[in-house]
Amino acid sequence: MKKFLFISAATLCISFPTFAGDYLTNTNQNAAFLRMIARGASIDIDGVYSNPAGLSFLSHEGFYLSLTGQSAYQTREIDANFPLFKQADGTNSSRLYKGTASAPFIPSFQGLYKKDNWVISASFAITGGGGKASFSNGLPMFDALAMGMITKQTDGQVTPQMYDINTSMDGKQYIYGVQLGLSYKINDWLSVFAGGRMNYFTGGYEGYLKTELKNDYTQIGQMMGLPDGKTLASIDLDCKQTGWGITPIIGADLKFNKLNIGLKYEFKANLNLENITEKMDLINVDRKYLADYEDGVNTPSDIPSMFSAAIGYEILPTLRASVEYHFFDDKHAGMANVTLPDGTSVAKQKTLKHGTHEYLAGMEWDITKRLTVSSGFQKTNYGLSNDFQTDTSFSCDSYSLGFGARVNLTQAWSIDVAYFWTHYNKYTKETDSYNGTGLKGSDIYNRTNKVFGLSLNYKF
């Protein structure tokens, strides 16, 4: 019986790395992006990230500085349907699991110095992740695996209503990016850029799993040989991760009177995350099943290459519009391995149908010399598959809306303020062996997202 406990408890844990190993590339590094979204052809201070080659076309020589603060809030929902949930709850076979991810303050800084045809620029930002996600009531994969394995190994004699499963998991991830580069205006219509970004990852996950017989059934636990008569399995884990990598960046900007074209390519950054395991307390669990969480173990988590192309056009002296395209080559960025339904193990990126495509558009209007209003739209398609999606790491195709304003306080000082909202398309994953239990089940994944941003800009 104890052998069964080892196997089931280990199965519950093998998906933990996918939570910390997956991340988002943050393109919102300035409130100007939040209020207009399509900023890849902008010639402004936020171009340090969105269009660095275009900085050479800035009219003012000297220093430009921008300090940004953003506040982001997300929810993640899993509507799980599994037949054993009905036995445990006595109601129906579905359960709703909800997690929250918040980042009250996401800072970023952008600065540059322009002299003649040359511009040197630098930035600091949280270029990936940026918050903490908490699932206080655990995840369906943990509950379903425990129920399925216990039912199978005891031939149904130990049923879900005889024990409690308590799980909780917190995960956090931050990728701090420091960027430095040079822009040069070759002639009146062409400028180029070369630079790089140093990425430092820090994050990890902390959680526990406890499966215990209820008080009315402790006698059964004693017959099973459980030390305290009730604990089937227990895991208490605290694992931190760190890693770093370099992203080379090149860009070009082509300016033809009212038309401007911005191009940028960010190369893949090879990133390996190293475990710093501070706690691994186990009861009825063989340590070898948690070998991936031992101190010093490395997991691939590359930052994918990215290509952006944008076209901006000045319709009127006071009205401008832009369209933009992004491609993230996720299929060639190393990720942790996942186990397929047939039992084989493959690198997670290979399960994607294609890399990420993003389509962006935006407009801004100078109502007066002091006030500019703007809005934008973004559509994101990830190329998701059932094998890529897990409870601990899932994404949903989406569209986003942003709007806001710039207030020119003086010739030197200005403020950008914006709100950014995302609608996600629900993703339904159905399987004949729900989380390896041999029973049919399904998950419906959904998310929400909203971001507030404020940037203070200064030039001299």
Predicted segments, located by residue:
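Sec-dependent N-terminal signal peptides
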Residues: 4-14
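Short stretches within intrinsically disordered, low-complexity N-terminal or propeptide regions
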Residues: 11-12, 90, 253
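Hydrophobic alpha-helical membrane-insertion segments
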Residues: 11-12, 60, 197, 326
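Residues in and immediately flanking transmembrane alpha helices
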Residues: 15-16, 64, 210, 382
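N-terminal, post-signal peptide beta-strand-biased segments of exported outer-membrane/organellar beta-barrel
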Residues: 16-126, 394, 420
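Outer-membrane beta-barrel porins/channels
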Residues: 21-38, 43, 106-108, 112-460
